[in-house]
Each structure stands twice: as C-alpha cells, then as structure tokens.
Amino acid sequence: MKMRSRKHLALLVLGLLFILITINLVNNRYTTLSSHDAQLTLNDSSAVCHILIRRANDSLFLSRRDNETWILPDQRIVNPAYLKFVFRIFSQLKIASVVPKNQWGAIRDSILRNGIEIAFYNQQQSILHNIYLFPDRQNQKTFALKKSAQEPFMVELPGYEGNFSGLFYLPVTQWYQPVIIHYNPQQIREIYVDHVESPDKSFTLRILPGQQPILLDIENDPHPYSEEALKAYLTFLRNISVEKYIDKQALYDSLAQTNPIYRVRIVDQADSVNQLTFYPIRIKGKIDKNFCYVLTPKGLVGIISYYRIDPVARPIEFFTSFGQ
C-alpha cells in the first residue's frame, strides 16, 4: 500500500514538473503571429510618397516626384534599383523564426540602439509603416521590430540569401542614381565632345528639328558625315553609369584644377544641359588604363570605366571615315 502511494506521489510530482516546464517553454517561445507586432509588411506601397531612413549618424529622406522618380533633399535622383529593392523587402518580408521571450528585451534594446529605422509616409506626411531592421552578430540574418512593439522577429526575404538590411547602411552617395548619360535619339539637340589633348578630334553634332544634322569640327567648320555613323552614335548615349561616387570635396576641387581627358556637353530638346568632365586616375604616378574620374553637374566625383565612356568620346573621324 505504501509502495503504491509512493508511486502515485512520484507520478504526481513528475506531472507537475512537466506542466511547469511546458508553461515555461510557452511563455518563452510562444508568439501569436497574427498579433500587431507580427504585421511587418507594407499594406499599400502606391500610397508611399516619402521614406525616412534613420541611421545612427545620419538620415536619408527620399521623396517621390510626379514622374515617379525619387529624389533626396539635395535634389539628386535616387538609384531606382535601390527603391525597387526597398519595396520588395517590405512587400515580401516574412518571419523566419520567433525569438524566445526571455531574449526580447536584450534584442529590442540592441535594435533600438544600433538598428536602422525605416518610416513610410503618405502625401499628407502621415506614417503608413514604421519598422526597425538590424543584422544578427554574424551579419548573416536580419531582425525586425515594429515601432513601439515589444516582440522582435528573425525575418527573411524569399529568394534572397543573407542579411538584406545592409542596403540601409550604405553611405548616401551609394543611393545616388549612377546613370550619367541616358538619352533617346529624338531627345538630343546638341552634343559637344572636346578631346583636350587632341583638339583636332573634337566635334559638335547639332540636331535641330526639321533640319539636316550638322557636324562641326573644333574650328566650327562643317564636315560631311555618314548617316549610318550618326544613327549608330546616337544609340551609344544610353545607360552609361558610374561604378560609384566618391564623396570628397577636396578631390573634386583638385581635379577641377587639372587638365581633363574629355569634356562632354549634351543639350536636349528642352534646353537641359548635361556637362561632364573626365580625368585620368593616377596611382603611384601611373595612369589607370581601365577607369577614370568624372565630374558631374551635381558636384560629384564618379569613377567610370573607359569602355563605358569611350563610345561617347569618339573622334570626329568616326563620322567622316565610317565604313572606310
């Protein structure tokens, strides 16, 4: 009888321990994925007119124009590929795993202290969505936390491997539109290409509505040209991008005092002028044969490969000797 009572007591104790362990696990690991904290995606991206990206040392404020391009406060255009990725993140973001409840506080504090805050606003400056992103210690995964929420989540982006929050840590110059030349043939009114060290290669191509295009040399004398060469040349003026921008005013000022390789001025039919100046890159006294600097109208220094700009900086002989 005593043995049976002891067995019952032991079973009762084990049962109580099991219940306590289960409750502890539930309290530490269970989350309601349908809760407000778990609603991490943006409901209506078409209503977004402004995006604030607040970092530890600075902030980016992006605004949408009527023509669907996005600009920064300095009026520089935002790289459209980055905007596309931002909206992809906040339309496809998924919870990869929940965080144990006993870790919420520590992780939330780290996110609020070191993470990136992204806020989406409509035209009336009302907040549509506000969320923090933060990489894990290995910089391979991403935590997400809604503004004023208690529960952080480990999140993932379908089809993307690794920590996608790195995009929001990039310096502002990396957010600039990298395309410096992009025109359709019918947009062009005038192109001037100055070969600084070989002026006899320089030319001006003038295209006025309803008139035959004119090719001029450095002395402003007209030259006959191949129409095939002209058509081919105008197709070169598309999607010409820098590799990256360098945010160094001292470098800009220094280059502006030296002799360039080329000067390119493009005037479109709306009288907008795109003036670009290209300079050699010198490393330990040697000229880089693959890349050069470019000074843009927006006061930026870019690095661009010669193979991208050489088709634009053709000599006048390209038009006069085409097919010979």
Place the predicted regions along the sequence by residue.
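Soluble, acidic/polar mature domains that operate outside membranes
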Residues: M1-Q324
